[in-house]
């Protein structure tokens, strides 16, 4: 690695939050918490059975606020990296939880939305939401009050803040992917974009992802072990550069 890095982009997926007790979508059988994805994570599913979809996310929202769900060592290490790096750290997460915020990160892009927010299905106005959203809960920001929905990007919808993400990738000198499968686009293409602009690339995963060949460096193991080790290396080189200045 060419130390020190000043513009780091970190892409995180379900693998980083799994160790905190957040259950993930099982790609092998297409189920999420025993529900079919098309039933609970698509606009069509919401139109077909809004009560089912609202209840599904209400349960996920309750689970996220369980006192036993806490940031793990990987989240805390990334928070430390942002706080101590002499430069920019951008967290681009596919996760809808708030564990990066609770781990200390501030510069976070939630490309798939946030579970603790809701939005108007017409105007897209977003509000904080810690309780249940029910069918019949209306947003009064519009001329015609409209149904509130989870602030979550469903399959078939456009991810959020893509312009900001691509701008960060253009200036990144280090791109790290943590806990991602490498099968969901556009996120799976970020490593290629970062490489095209000259960034060093690192994959941290339990096992090789579908795009592992795109990465220059690979580290396999638990995120709670591998991420703190990498952050220690990055900050140690930063300190040595300061001492030698």
Swiss-Prot record:
Details of cofactor binding: Binds 1 zinc ion per subunit.
GO annotation, cellular component aspect: cytoplasm
GO molecular function: histone deacetylase activity, NAD-dependent; NAD+ binding; protein-malonyllysine demalonylase activity; protein-succinyllysine desuccinylase activity; zinc ion binding
Group of enzyme by EC: transferase
Broad class of the protein's primary localization: cytoplasm
Catalytic activity: N(6)-acetyl-L-lysyl-[protein] + NAD(+) + H2O = 2''-O-acetyl-ADP-D-ribose + nicotinamide + L-lysyl-[protein]; N(6)-succinyl-L-lysyl-[protein] + NAD(+) + H2O = 2''-O-succinyl-ADP-D-ribose + nicotinamide + L-lysyl-[protein]
Positions annotated as active site in the UniProt record: 112
Sequence positions that bind substrate: 57, 60
Compartment(s): Cytoplasm
Record EC number: 2.3.1.286
Cofactor: Zn(2+)
Residues the record lists as binding Zn(2+): 120, 139
Domain Deacetylase sirtuin-type: 1-237
Keywords per UniProt: Cytoplasm, Metal-binding, NAD, Transferase, Zinc
Lineage: superkingdom: Bacteria
Binding site for NAD(+): 13-32, 94-97, 179-181, 205-207, 223
Function recorded in the entry: NAD-dependent lysine deacetylase and desuccinylase that specifically removes acetyl and succinyl groups on target proteins. Modulates the activities of several proteins which are inactive in their acylated form.
Record remark: domains: 2 residues (Tyr-57 and Arg-60) present in a large hydrophobic pocket are probably involved in substrate specificity. They are important for desuccinylation activity, but dispensable for deacetylation activity.
Family membership noted in the UniProt record: Belongs to the sirtuin family. Class III subfamily.
UniProt-recorded name of the protein: NAD-dependent protein deacylase
Organism, as annotated: Vibrio vulnificus (strain YJ016)
Gene: cobB
């Amino acid at each position: 690695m060419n130390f020190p890095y000043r513009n780091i982009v970190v892409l995180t997926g379900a693998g980083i939050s799994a160790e905190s007790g957040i259950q993930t979508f099982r790609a092998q059988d297409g189920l999420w918490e025993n529900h079919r994805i098309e039933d609970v994570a698509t606009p069509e599913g919401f139109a077909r059975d809004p009560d089912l979809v609202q209840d599904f996310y209400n349960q996920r929202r309750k689970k996220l606020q369980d006192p036993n769900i806490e940031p793990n060592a990987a989240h805390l290490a990334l928070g430390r990296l942002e706080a101590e790096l002499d430069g920019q750290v951008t967290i681009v997460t596919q996760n809808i939880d708030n564990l990066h915020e609770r781990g200390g990160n501030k510069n976070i892009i939630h490309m798939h939305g946030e579970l603790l927010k809701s939005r108007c299905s017409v105007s897209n106005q977003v509000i904080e939401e810690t309780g249940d959203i029910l069918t019949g809960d209306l947003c009064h920001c519009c001329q015609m009050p409209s149904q509130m929905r989870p602030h979550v990007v469903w399959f078939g919808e456009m991810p959020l803040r893509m312009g900001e993400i691509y701008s960060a990738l253009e200036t990144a000198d280090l791109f790290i992917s943590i806990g991602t499968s490498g099968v969901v686009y556009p996120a799976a293409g970020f490593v290629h974009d970062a490489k095209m602009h000259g960034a060093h690339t690192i994959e941290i995963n339990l096992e090789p992802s579908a795009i592992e060949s795109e990465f220059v460096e690979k580290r396999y193991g638990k995120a709670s072990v591998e991420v703190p080790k990498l952050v220690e290396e990055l900050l140690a080189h930063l300190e040595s550069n300061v001492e030698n200045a």
